[in-house]
């Protein structure tokens, strides 16, 4: 037997032995309270300028500690009414710091049963709704215990296996893991893959995932980020106690009153009274939408930015959208950069947006990156709830936006030269219900802030179908003087098109300008 044949023959035994050694190392170090360092990964994380340019609906797995308080159930109702926007490949019932020894898949099944009663009506308004049976078959139980103590070599759960199957699927699209509770089911899946595959195979596995976690609700989130540094991870790191939740971007979904961090936001459309009138009063799904105990739908931002509304925020977290805006940096206590909050105030590269509030004054905060879109995402939800009980002619539907002859929702990429005018024409946009349309173009000045240069632009005709954009500088001014501005700049122009229906619905298009001076082109 030659050496190559012998090596191939011994490969299964070699890999099995390697797996045993890895698990042994893991167990010993965990028992000693130490962070395992017996697994190393050489692959680099995706660069912060990477754009997920895939075709098709986003693939998602939801991990929820549903049952501990009402907001998970609220978010789950909204998720089901947008289930035609995603490919939901798994729904995992998990534990968390608020629910350490129980999981509640039965609540998920009950909500899916109600969805099944309205699916035929939803099909009158849009295509792509999964059947209730399909969704029921994708509900899994995650790790039954809390945090790191519940993971290990012999602790695989159905939820962890579902994550592995979904990642391994032959599909070029990344898999979004939306974490509403604890992260230990994801940790178990990662541990199993790392112990049973080569380093290169495990790297490729990790590279297929995109994680958006609603803070850290057990002790595995920080552990995952230390052990798998090339994993794409959106999170504002936090303690497990929740005493710093008020700082997190996701609270911008509705947390203004409870967390006292939403000055400028319109809190009237996230009250129980508004929800009674616009959500709970409508059909089987509305009846299962509970009153909130603390805030409305704290977990919803994890998937809200994946909705195909024209903002395309899921392609790069610093572009900003309904799920918030994040930048790539290394927070205190983390071992490497992640997608998170904070930034450099002096260079004006931060995760905060400056937005006009309901009183007309400007407010700057991380939460504003979500609440700036609140009227649109709440009206959109109310319209979806109408779809569950009304026929097409008595419900409202989103405008269809066309810019410079390009229909669809993909961003437009255009070169622009400083000092030269650029016409953006959306006059061919239309409303499927025949209603009037209102246009608003604006420069999203903070979007794309990972890029070296954020350009300056002006917009004339901002409230008409045809706007004229003029780039005034490759680099915008900073609070501190700096040297010469080199290279090209970037500017994101957002078009919001709103109809006259009830509720009024908004669709968007994003135009990304690469700005250069005539001398550098």
Each model region followed by its residue ranges:
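Bacterial N-terminal signal peptides
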Residues: 23-37
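Surface-exposed, flexible coil segments in extracellular/virion-facing regions
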Residues: 443-480
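N-terminal acidic, glycine/proline-rich low-complexity segments
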Residues: 41-423, 429-455
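Short, solvent-exposed loop/turn segments at the edges of extracellular beta-sandwich modules
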Residues: 498-504
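N-terminal secretory signal peptides that target proteins for export/translocation
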Residues: 1-19
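Extracellular interdomain linker/stem segments of modular secreted and single-pass surface proteins
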Residues: 514-521
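Extracellular and select intracellular beta-sandwich modules with Ser/Thr-enriched
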Residues: 504-511
């Amino acid at each position: 037997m030659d050496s190559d044949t012998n090596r191939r023959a011994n490969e299964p035994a070699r890999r099995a032995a390697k797996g045993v050694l890895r698990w042994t190392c893991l167990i010993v170090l965990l028992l000693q309270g130490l962070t395992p360092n017996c697994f190393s990964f050489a692959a680099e994380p995706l660069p912060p300028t990477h754009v997920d340019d895939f075709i098709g609906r986003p693939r998602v797995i939801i991990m929820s500690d549903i049952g501990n308080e009402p907001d998970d159930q609220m978010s789950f109702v909204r998720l089901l009414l947008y289930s035609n926007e995603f490919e939901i490949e798994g729904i995992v019932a998990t534990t968390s710091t608020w629910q350490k020894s129980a999981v509640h898949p039965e609540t998920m099944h009950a909500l899916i049963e109600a969805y099944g009663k309205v699916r035929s009506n939803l099909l009158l308004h849009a295509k792509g709704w999964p059947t209730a049976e399909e969704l029921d078959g994708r509900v899994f139980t995650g790790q039954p215990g809390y945090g790191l103590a519940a993971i290990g070599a012999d602790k695989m759960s159905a939820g962890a296996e579902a994550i592995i199957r979904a990642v391994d699927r032959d599909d070029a699209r990344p898999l979004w893991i939306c974490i509403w509770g604890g992260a230990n089911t994801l940790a178990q899946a990662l541990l199993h893959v790392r112990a049973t595959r080569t380093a290169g195979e495990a790297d490729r596995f990790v590279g297929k995932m995109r994680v958006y976690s609603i803070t850290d609700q057990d002790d595995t989130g920080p552990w995952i980020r230390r052990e798998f540094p090339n994993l794409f991870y959106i999170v504002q790191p936090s303690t497990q106690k929740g005493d710093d939740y008020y700082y997190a971007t996701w609270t911008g979904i509705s947390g203004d009153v409870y967390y006292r961090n939403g000055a400028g936001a319109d809190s009237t459309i996230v009250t129980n009274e508004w929800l009674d009138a616009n959500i709970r009063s409508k059909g089987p799904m509305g009846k299962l939408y509970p009153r909130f105990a603390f805030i409305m739908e704290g977990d919803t931002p994890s998937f809200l930015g994946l909705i195909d509304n024209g903002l395309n925020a899921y392609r790069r977290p610093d572009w900003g959208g309904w799920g918030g805006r994040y930048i790539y940096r290394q927070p205190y206590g983390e071992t490497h950069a992640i997608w998170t909050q904070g930034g450099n105030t002096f260079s004006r590269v931060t995760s905060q947006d400056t937005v006009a509030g309901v009183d007309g004054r400007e407010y700057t905060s991380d939460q504003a990156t979500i609440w700036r879109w609140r009227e649109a995402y709440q009206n959109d939800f109310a319209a979806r709830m109408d779809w569950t009980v009304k026929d097409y002619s008595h419900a409202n539907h989103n405008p269809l936006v066309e810019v410079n002859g390009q229909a669809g929702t993909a961003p437009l990429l255009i070169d622009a030269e400083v000092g030269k005018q650029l016409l953006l024409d959306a006059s061919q946009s239309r409303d499927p219900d025949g209603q009037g349309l209102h246009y608003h173009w604006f420069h999203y000045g903070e979007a794309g802030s990972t890029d070296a240069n954020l350009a300056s632009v002006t917009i004339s005709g901002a409230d008409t179908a045809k706007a004229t954009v003029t780039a005034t500088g490759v680099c915008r001014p900073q609070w501190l003087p700096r040297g010469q501005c080199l290279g090209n700049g970037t500017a994101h122009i957002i078009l919001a098109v709103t109809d006259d229906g009830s509720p009024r619905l908004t669709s968007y298009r994003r135009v990304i300008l690469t700005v250069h001076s005539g001398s550098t082109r």
